[in-house]
Structures are given as C-alpha cells and as structure tokens.
Swiss-Prot record:
The gene is ZC3H15. Protects DRG1 from proteolytic degradation. Residues 53-62 have a biased composition (Polar residues). One of its GO terms (biological process) is cytokine-mediated signaling pathway. This is Zinc finger CCCH domain-containing protein 15. Interacts with DRG1; the interaction forms a polysomal DRG1-DFRP1/ZC3H15 complex which provides protein stability to DRG1 possibly by blocking poly-ubiquitination.
C-alpha cells in the first residue's frame, strides 16, 4: 500500500491571502477611517510587512516592474504571431439596402482577399475618409421631400399627402423657421452626427434642423473675440502711430487749458440736463426724480417745511461723563494744489569724488570703532558729543561717583590664592 501524500504545509494561496487580510484587519482595526498622516503611514507599513514580510520596498517595486515587462513581452509575441500567421477574419455583414462598394473589404485590410476585382466590397482604403459628411446647414428632411415626387406615388400615398397638406391637424400645426434648440445644443457640445436623434420628437420635430446662412456658433465667436484682443501696450502704440508727426507737445499750459475746457464742457452739459429735467418735471413727464431735484425745481417747499416743523425747544443737559476732545483743525490751503513746473535752476549733481571721500571717512570711523581705540585716536561718537554739549549748557558736567575701596589689598590677595589653587584642564 503506497504511503499517503503529505498535505501542503503552507496551504492554498487563497487561504494564505485570507489569513494575511485577517491579520491586517486586526492590526489596523479602527484606523482605516483616520485621516492623519501618522495613522495612514502605520497602516501602509503594517500592510507591507504582512504581505511581503521583511522584504525591502525597492525589491518589491523591482519585482512588480519585472512582472509588467513580462506582460508587455507576451503581448508583443502575440502581435508578432498574428502578423505572421494572419488569424481568420469573420465574414463581413452589411445592412439591407446598403451599397457593398461603400464598405472596405475586411479581408483586403488584412491582406488576405484573393478575389481581386471580383470582390463585391471595395478595396479602396481611403474610402472611409472620402465619405460625405453630414452638413449642419442642410435639413435632410428637405432633400427627402424634394426627391419624393408624384411620379413615384400610388393612390394610397397620394391620399396621405393630401391629408397632411390640407388636413385640419396640419392647419392647426404652426409653420415656423425657428431652429431647434436641441439641434443647436448638440452642435455647440460636439454631439451632432449621423446617429444623433432630436429629443424633441426625432424626425417629427416641428422646428428646423439646419442653420440659417451666415449663422455663427458661440464657440466660433469666442475664438474670433480672442483673436481680436490686443494688449494695452499695442493699443497705445497703435493710437500714437495713427496721430502722425504733426502733433502739439504737451506742456503745463496746454494741459491746463485742455483741463479747463473739458471741465467747462462738463458743467455746460450738466446744466443742460438739469434744464431738460426741470422742463420735464413741470410738464409732468419726469416720473422718477430724486428728493434733491424736487427742492431744486420747487424751492417754495423748503419754506412750507419750516412752517410745519415742530416749534418745541429742547435743552441739552451737560453730563459729567462728557470728555472735551480738543482737536486742532487746519484749513485747506488751495494754493497747495496749483500745478507748477519743476524749477531746474540751481540743481547740481554731486561728483564721484565726493562719494568716494565720504565712503573712505566712514570706513576709517568703523575701523577705529571696531578696534576699540576711539580715545586713543582722539575720536568721539555723536552720543558722547551730545552728552558733553548738554553738560556744558547746564554749566557743569555730572561726574560718576567711584568707590575707591572696591578693590582693597585683601581682596586682591584672596583672588591670587584662588587662581593658584584652581585646577586647569588641558
């Protein structure tokens, strides 16, 4: 009797995968919905440790890249085999009534058609690109009506046409040249094509499915507007070049004269508008006017308001909590706003030697201050000079009191003993 086969120690791959998922779920219980970076990093580390053990993340990424390369190699091999052995092409089917010569032969595309000129399908690979596109400026229903003449009608068809043309339902139906909104939306959103069906009833839609001549779409308008846009600098340069060379130079006098003329034109226009509105108000034409205009057009209303006002006098009590805020008020001097030319007389430019001498003096001062020798070099800071000046003005210089018994002989002896007994580490 042969010995029994030993069961696999590791078990099946599915069982191992379930165990790993169970361990990951137990260790990350309650942390999956946490959005913190630490929790997400911990979950990622636990998942990697359970799935790949102590394997390096670089090795895992390398193994995945190798698997991907193997898949790509297999795909390339299949493509090469298909090109070499030419797989079987399914029989071609076309819809009833369609012209076979308008369809490219599938076997000819693969290079397997042996019929040649006898093949009922077309062998012209450019035929698909030569197909007529559907025009958005022509309604296909109009063409069908033009081709559908009385020569091809029978008695039943004739009755149907008469009922449609002169029937009561057709008379009640409004005739319109309005373009269908669904048709326009489909064109604007690039959804219009051979298989597009109008949501408003398909071929029964009462509105036209063709654009009128000269109609411009919104997307084309936006493109034209973007092309017409120019920058502010280009606009200024274009306007300047259009003025020509014979122009008046702008000076203070010409600018003030232009400003005065514009201001006077504005005042005249405002007065004309007020006179016109006043005439409309008197004639009863102005229905909407402001309260200010009412009192301007009828000043007598101000006196009427004073007569109807309350004559009661109120005395204002002086409270103890009032604070007297004394604020200095300065009158506006209009002479400050008078434009003037810049007076360039008397303006001088400093020479380069002055700047070089000034910088050298500053560098010397900084050097003496850094070396701590201001007293030796006979230099003093601005602060010392100010303090000295203040002291001389007061008539005496305040001396700093010095304690002469601060360092006696006993203190110095104790200091020397401490220095001698101090252990110095090298």
């Amino acid at each position: 009797m042969p010995p029994k086969k030993q069961a696999q120690a590791g078990g099946s791959k599915k069982a191992e995968q379930k165990k790993k998922e169970k361990i990951i779920e137990d260790k990350t219980f309650g942390l999956k919905n946490k959005k913190g970076a630490k929790q997400q990093k911990f979950i990622k580390a636990v998942t990697h440790q359970v799935k790949f053990g102590q394997q390096n993340p670089r090795q895992v990424a390398q193994s995945e890249a190798e698997k991907k390369l193997k898949k790509d190699d297999k795909k390339k091999e299949l493509q090469e085999l298909n090109e070499l052995f030419k797989p079987v092409v399914a029989a071609q089917k076309i819809s009833k009534g369609a012209d076979p010569k308008s369809v490219v032969c599938a076997f000819f595309k693969q290079g397997q058609c042996t019929k040649g000129d006898k093949c009922k399908f077309s062998h012209d690979l450019t035929l698909e690109r030569k197909c007529e596109k559907r025009s958005v400026y022509i309604d296909a229903r109009d063409e069908e009506l033009e081709k559908d003449t009385m020569d091809n009608w029978d008695e039943k068809k004739l009755e149907e046409v008469v009922n449609k043309k002169h029937g009561e339902a057709e008379k009640k139906k409004p005739k319109t040249q309005i373009v269908c909104k669904h048709f326009l939306e489909a064109i604007e959103n690039n959804k219009y094509g051979w298989f597009w069906v109008c949501p408003g009833g398909g071929d029964i839609c009462m509105y036209r499915h063709a654009l009128p001549p000269g109609f411009v779409l919104k997307k084309d308008k936006k493109k034209e507007e973007k092309e017409d846009e120019i920058s502010l600098e280009d606009l200024i340069e274009r306007e300047r070049s259009a003025l020509g060379p014979n122009v008046t130079k702008i000076t203070l006098e010409s600018f003030l004269a232009w400003k005065k003329r514009k201001r006077q034109e504005k005042i005249d226009k405002l007065e004309q508008d007020i006179e016109r509105r006043k005439a409309d108000f008197k004639a009863g034409k102005a229905l909407v006017i402001s309260g200010r205009e009412v009192f301007e057009f009828r000043p007598e209303l101000v006196d009427d308001d004073d007569e109807e006002a309350d004559d009661t006098r109120y005395t204002q009590g002086t409270g103890g909590d009032e604070v007297d805020d004394s604020v200095s008020v300065n009158d506006i001097d209009l002479s400050l706003y008078i434009p003037r030319d810049v007076d360039e007389t008397g303006i001088t430019v400093a020479s380069l030697e002055r700047f070089s001498t000034y910088t050298s003096e500053k560098d010397e001062n900084k050097l003496s201050e850094a070396s701590g020798g201001r007293a030796e070099n006979g230099e003093r800071s601005d602060l010392e000079e100010d303090n000295e000046g203040e002291g001389q003005e007061n008539g005496a210089i305040d001396a700093v009191p010095v304690d002469e018994n601060l360092f006696t002989g006993e203190d110095l002896d104790e200091l020397e003993e401490e220095l001698n007994t101090l252990d110095l580490e090298e």
